[in-house]
Amino acid sequence: MRFFLLMAVIYTTLAIAPVHFDREKVFRVKLQNEKHASVLKNLTQSIELDFWYPDAIHDIAVNMTVDFRVSEKESQTIQSTLEQHKIHYEILIHDLQEEIEKQFDVKDEIAGRHSYAKYNDWDKIVSWTEKMLEKHPEMVSRIKIGSTVEDNPLYVLKIGKKDGERKAIFMDCGIHAREWISPAFCQWFVYQATKSYGKNKIMTKLLDRMNFYVLPVFNVDGYIWSWTQDRMWRKNRSRNQNSTCIGTDLNRNFDVSWDSSPNTNKPCLNVYRGPAPESEKETKAVTNFIRSHLNSIKAYITFHSYSQMLLIPYGYTFKLPPNHQDLLKVARIATDALSTRYETRYIYGPIASTIYKTSGSSLDWVYDLGIKHTFAFELRDKGKSGFLLPESRIKPTCKETMLSVKFIAKYILKNTS
C-alpha cells in the first residue's frame, strides 16, 4: 500500500508542470470606506485573487491595507476598477516570477549543501536534522511525532540536556507552505542554541534548565509542493471529498472555535478549515504531542510571515485572555529586544484586534488547552517582498528574532511553575 501511495505521489508530481507567475502582480490597496471594501469584494466574484494580507476576502475591513496577487490577464481590469472608484493602490511586485527568481540572491558556499544563509528544501532539512544529531548527541534528539498524508515524517528536535524532566517551550515553523522564512528561523534557532552552548551565558543557562521542542516544518507536504510545483502554495496536500481542490489550511484546523469564521468551509479557499477539527494528520500529530507533554510545556511559539508582528490570543474573539497584561508585557519587551539589532520595528497585540478575527488557530488552541504563554511571530517584511523575502535577509531576520525568543525563554524560565 505504501509503495502504491508513493508511486501515486511521484506520478502526480511528474504529471503536473510547475506553476509559472510571469508578469503576475501584487497589489496593495487602501480601503478607506465601506464602498471601497464593497468594490474589492465584488471584484472577487469575477476575478481570482490570491490574498496575501489578510488571508481571505471575508477578513477585509474599512481602513485596512490589503495585499493580493492577480494574473497578468486580469491586472489591467483591477487597475481600471480601482482608479474608477478612486481607491488608492500601489503595485508592490510587477513581475512575480522575476521576484521569485531574485529571491535566491545568496550564492551556494558548496553546491547542494545545507546553508543557514539560504532557503533549504525538505531533503536538505532532513539531512540537516541527522547532522545535528551526530554533532550534538548530548544536546539534540529527534522525535518522529507522526507522518503526513504523503507519508513524509514529522520530526521534532528536542534541544536541551537529556537528564530529567524540566520546563519546555514548543516552537513550530512552516505551518503555511509559502512562508519560507519561517522554517529558516527554526533551523537557525537550533544551530545557534547548540553552537552557543557553553559560550553564551544566557543560552547555556536556558539549555541547562529547560528543553526546546522544535518542529522545523509543520506542513511538510505543502512545503515540498511550494518548492517543486507552486511557490505560492499555502495549505497541506490532503484530498478533499466531493471537491477537486486540494489541501486544508492547518492553521484553521485546530479544535477551537473551529467553524466560526465565514467561508472557511469551502475547500477551494486558501483558508479551508478541513472537514472536521484535527482532521489533518499534521494537526493531529502536533496536538497529540502537546497533550502528552502538557505538564512540561510552559510556552508555545509559532512562526509565520509576513507583517512584522508579535501576536497573542485571542484570534476567534475580541475578548482578552485573563493574563493579557502579562502577555502584552512580554510581547512589548520581546519586540524591543528584537529592535536592538537592526532597528526593525514590530507591532504587538491580540490577533483579533491587531490584524483580524480568525478561527481554528494553533495559538488559541494551545492557550485554551492550558499553556498560558503563547505567541505568534509574523516575521519580515512588511510587504515589499511579502512571502518572497530574499535570502540576503535571512540572517538579519533570524539574528533579531533570536534576541526576542531568548527573552521570552528567560521569562518563562523565571516566571512559570
Curated annotation (Swiss-Prot):
GO biological process: angiotensin maturation; regulation of angiotensin levels in blood
Keywords annotated in UniProt: Carboxypeptidase, Cytoplasmic vesicle, Disulfide bond, Hydrolase, Metal-binding, Metalloprotease, Protease, Signal, Zinc, Zymogen
Pfam families, per database record: Peptidase_M14, Propep_M14
Residues of the Peptidase M14 domain: 118-412
Gene Ontology molecular function: metallocarboxypeptidase activity; peptidase activity; zinc ion binding
Recorded superkingdom: Eukaryota
Active site: E378
Record Gene3D superfamilies: Metallocarboxypeptidase-like, Zn peptidases
InterPro entries hit by this protein: M14A-like_propep, M14A_act_pep, Peptidase_M14
CC cofactor: Zn(2+)
Protein name: Mast cell carboxypeptidase A
Lineage: Eukaryota, Metazoa, Chordata, Craniata, Vertebrata
Annotated gene: Cpa3
